[in-house]
Amino acid sequence: MIGEIGYIFLIFAFTLSFLQFFNSVKISFFYFSEESFKFLKSLTYFISFFLLFSFFSLIISYVISDFSILNIYNNSHTNKPLLYKISGTWGNHEGSLLMWLAMLGLYGLLFTKFTNQESSIFNSRALFAISIINIGFIGFTIFTSNPFERITPIPLEGNGLNPVLQDPGLAFHPPLLYLGYVGLTIPFAYSIAALLEEKIDNQWAKAIRPWILAPWIFLTLGISLGSFWAYYELGWGGWWFWDPVENISLLPWLLSTALLHSNRVTEKRNNLKSWTILLSIIAFSLTLLGTFIVRSGLLTSVHAFASDPARGVFILSFLFLVTFFSLILYALKYEKIENNKSFHLISKEGGLLLNNVFLCASAATILLGTLWPLFVEVTTGKDISVGSPYFKLVFLPLIIPAIYLSGISINLNWKLNAMQSILDKLGKFFIIFIFIIIGIAFILEGPVMMILGLSLSVWLFLS
């Protein structure tokens, strides 16, 4: 019975998402009224609650071992500890998608509750973008990945959770990572709304900042915890194996880091506005690309959930439509939103822009190495792999300057800095950095890159 309730909640959320879409279109482009906006907010609340309740219904079904649900039969067992029963909910394709939806509902709830209520039309346009994401993902879950699918006759016992996943890391790593992935929906929605309004200023940048920072924090925690889990679980290949799914999780983090820096320039100097918008769109698109890679089976990965081309086609089509129309809108509105002022390279904004270049180039090299085997297979029919030698060769020379520049940029002034002042600061920074490396190398005995990585981490912290 609980399974049916959870499925009905999904159907309700899907139906209301269409109402959310049509109502947001009416308010954003045709006719605004306070009553319509209040109704739109109510729809968003109901969608959020239905998605959260649907997810909790699946968790409860796991806890009580309802093996009449195929998903639970395949991934749980009555004798499993409570922790693994609960975390088993998202240790599979269908359950993880429902967790994605629950977090999408949570972010929609928080956005509606805490955004500036005076900007009703702007918020309606942001909810217009969110409604499209709701329809796409809820529809994908209902029609291709129903987590509440029944099985008959009802088995007496389940198959149990995959032994590799029976680790406390499963309870925290995927939720943190998904909070980061899904959280980038809000900056994306903010950017679409700003393009539609043709207004991007420092107030917009200030409002969007916490919605960028929160996903970045969750992605940082999720990736770090995943690396630690991979380290002590030998089956995953060490701290970082340059696996396609690992790579694709790093891409949104790199882009959201660049987005944080770019948005800071927009907030403080009213500059790099179009670049900030573009980063928001691409960062979110990369989360959709990650979903495609994990669930399509087109790239081999120890982290992949499923190998179902039909699901892959659905996600790829959705990725194409969202990204294509977002970039078309960006191109149409570019001249109306961009009024970049020139600034000196030797300044905080110049340093942050240069840092952005390195971060985006780093992301591009990872994306190329991850998708290259797929491109070669499609064009030539040959099966190749791109391993750590490539990534170490092209990624490290880009990310090391990016990290070092971050520490320097923080200490520069806005506008122009005197060259002598810069040289003095650079000299001090370089000496401090050398002492950090020597100190860590003296304390630790390990590979050069490990020492350099720790040194850069300390460098950033001290900066």
Functional labels for PLM-detected ranges:
Residues 1-33, 51-53, 244-251, 280-281, ...:
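Contiguous transmembrane helix-bundle modules in multi-pass membrane proteins
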Residues 11-25, 96-151, 155-227, 235:
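A conserved hydrophobic secondary-structure block that centers on an alpha-helix together
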Residues 95-101, 178-181, 241-254, 289, ...:
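Structural signature of hydrophobic alpha-helical transmembrane segments
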Residues 133-143, 183, 215-224, 283-290, ...:
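Alpha-helical transmembrane segments of multi-pass integral membrane proteins
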